[in-house]
Amino acid sequence: LNAISNFFVPNQRIISVEDTRELVLPKILHWVPLETRLPNPEGKGGIQMLDLIVNSLRMRPDRIVVGEIRRKMEAEVLFEAMHTGHSVYGTLHANNAKETINRLTNPPIDLPKQILSALSLIVVQHINRRTVKRRTLQIAEVLPNGDARILMQLNPIKDTFEIVNE
């Protein structure tokens, strides 16, 4: 998400929502970082990711950036934001585009496949722990039926990114 933020217009209002603050957006002039908080020993004062996502919609964002989608309610609110016209960026742990769709449409997130058409692209990245290099493995578009169609994919033998479908 840090890398893609270089393509954001600097004067846009960006709201980021994270469990642990990892994003750094120095070029963004109007960045509002929101971070979850654990409750105190009495069990009060905790701030959940869902609360922050819901509140971010009230802050008139140009873009919403969510560190990681883990729960059904978070995903539902994000997709609702997408369907109402907000630009939303988020991460999810998956090994490829098809697995991303499966993670979103099966428990614990369990969204209906039809609403996935709100997604434009799925970008799958991987960090090679041996070489400590980050690589984009796949770029896929989400079709109206909710399936992913691979557009570009890494050729690991040539270490090049190749067009699969146009």
Whereabouts are the PLM-identified features?
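Conserved P-loop NTPase
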Residues: 121-166
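Switch/coupling sub-region of P-loop NTPases
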Residues: 3-114, 118-128
